[in-house]
Each structure stands twice: as C-alpha cells, then as structure tokens.
From Swiss-Prot:
Alphabetized SUPFAM superfamilies for the sequence: Single hybrid motif
Function: The glycine cleavage system catalyzes the degradation of glycine. The H protein shuttles the methylamine group of glycine from the P protein to the T protein.
Organism: Bartonella tribocorum (strain CIP 105476 / IBS 506)
Keywords annotated in UniProt: Lipoyl
Identification of the protein by name: Glycine cleavage system H protein
Record PTM N6-lipoyllysine, positions in chain: 60
C-alpha cells in the first residue's frame, strides 16, 4: 500500500516500501501552463534532498524540480520525452517524473500530508 506525501515546492511523492515515485502536483502544473519540454535525471543518479533534479519547461517559464529525499534514481518516465503534456493532463498519475530509492525514512517526517498541502495552496 503506497502513501502519498507533498513538498512545499509542489512535488508529490508516492512511497511504496523503499520505492518512491516523484512528480509535480496538479497545482504546480496549473501555475506552469502548457509544458513543452521535460529534462529528467538519468537512471543511476544519486540525489540529495533539495537538489535540483529535473527541469520542466512551459510556454511561460522553466522551473527546477527538486529531489524531495536522498536516494538513487532507478527509473524515469520515458513517455515524457515525446509527451511532456502528460504532466499537464495527468500530473499526479501517468505524468510522474522519476522513481527513486528511499534511503532515509526519517526524511518523510518533514513532508506534508494531503491536508497540510491543501492548506498550503489554500
């Protein structure tokens, strides 16, 4: 059973055991507008919490996506290479960005649950 968390930088995480799927929230993609390009980390990349890991580029602006946790990228969403608009259409499902390992479970305590995230975006 997976559990979903959110960051103040508008990323969502689905945690299932030691596997974490990361994406941008529906709110974030609305703020960005239509995405035209997504630059993802390479599989095998070791990320530190807070490190810029990906870039999402829209017709309005380019924005960094930060790693919400320490871990290693094990898979990227290859579908976004040809279809970056999946992030706009299905931000919190098929529009995920990368999957990574969970190295330090205590970092999850610093994340937001759904209610706290909804309060943040008001």
């Amino acid at each position: 059973m997976s559990k979903t968390y959110f960051t103040q930088d508008h990323e969502w995480l689905s945690v299932d055991g030691q596997m974490v799927t990361v994406g941008v929230t529906h709110y974030a993609q609305e703020q960005l507008g239509d995405l035209v390009f997504v630059d993802l980390p390479q599989s095998g990349t070791k990320l530190s919490k807070g490190e810029a890991a990906a870039v999402v580029e829209s017709v309005k602006a380019a924005s960094d996506v930060y790693s919400p946790l320490d871990g290693e990228v094990v898979e990227i969403n290859e579908a976004l290479t040809d279809n970056p608009e999946l992030v706009n259409q299905k931000a919190e499902t098929e529009g995920w960005l990368w999957k990574m390992t969970l190295q330090d479970e205590t970092q999850l305590e610093e994340l937001l649950d759904e209610d706290a995230y909804k309060a943040l975006i008001g």
